[in-house]
Amino acid sequence: MKTARSASPQTEEDLPLILDKLYFERGWDFRDYKATSLKRMLLKRLSALNVPTYKDYLDILEKDPEEYNELFSCLMVKVSEFFREPEAFSYLHGELPRLTLSGQGLKAWCAACATGEEAYSLAMLFTESLSPESLQKTKVYATDICPGALDSARKAVYRDESLVNVSPAMKEKYFFPHGHAHKVKYSIRNLVRFGCHDLVKDWPLAKVDVLFCRNLFIYFNKPLQDEVFKKLDSALKKGGVLALGKAEVLPQPFSSSYSRLGPGANIYRKTG
C-alpha cells in the first residue's frame, strides 16, 4: 500500500503547481519559500490524508475548496514561546534608556507574530522597564498573515510549555489562571494591537523603534529575503533595534548599516 512518503522526486514538478493554485485561488503566496521547508511541511498534510503524491493532492484541491484552508495552516510556522532566545530581550533591555530619552514612548513591530507570545513578551519587558510616562506612549503592533494565529493571539491563553522562560514572579504579575492554562492580563494585552499583514505583498509600518522578525527568513529564498528585508529596513528608524532569528543573517546590501549588540543573540542597532 502506498503512503505519503512515496511523494518522490518524480512528482516534485507538481509542487509549484500546488503553490500556484494556492496563490491564484486564495492570494496566499508561498512560491518563493524554500522548497525544502515547504516539502517537509506539506508531507505532514499528505501523511494525514494518506495521499501518496503531490498529483493526488492536486486532485483533492480541485474537489474540495476547503482544503485550501488546511494547506495554508499546514504551511504556516506557529512555533513560539514567551521570551524565546532570552538574550535578545536582555540586549533590548539595555537599549531602552537610549530609545526613550526625554520620556518618549516606543513604537514596536512584531512582524510574523504567530500566536502572540513574542508580542506580549515585548509588552511585559516595556512594562517592567519604562517609566510610566514612556509606557503610556508605547504600543506594540503585532502582525501575521494567518487569521487563525491572530485569533489565538487575541485570546491570549497559553499552556505551561509556552511559559518556560517566564519567572514565577512575572507569571503571577502578568497572567491569571484560565482552566488548565494561563491568560495574559489586560494591562499587557492593552499594549498590543494585532492585525493581518503579508510581509511579501503589503506595505510595511513606518517610524518603528523596535522591530522583531525572527525565524521567518529561514523559509524564504535569497531574492525574497532581500525583498522583504528592504521593507523592514525602511520601517525601522535610524538608531532603532532589529531582532532576527539565531539562524538568520543580515542580507549583504544592508549589513554595513547595522551594528550587532553583542554575542549570543541576533539583535542589532541600525546605524545607517
Stretches found by the model and what they are:
Residues G103-S121, K139-Y141:
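Conserved class I S-adenosyl-L-methionine
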Residues T115-E133:
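Conserved SAM-binding loop of SAM-dependent methyltransferases across substrates and taxa
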Residues P132-F212, L216-E227, V249-L250, S256-Y258, ...:
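Extended basic-aromatic, gly/pro-enriched interface segments that bind polyanionic ligands
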Residues D226-K238:
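A short glycine-rich, Lys/Arg-flanked "PGG" loop and its adjoining helix->strand segment in the class I
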Residues G262-I267:
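Short hydrophobic/aromatic beta-strand or adjacent loop that forms the aromatic wall/cage
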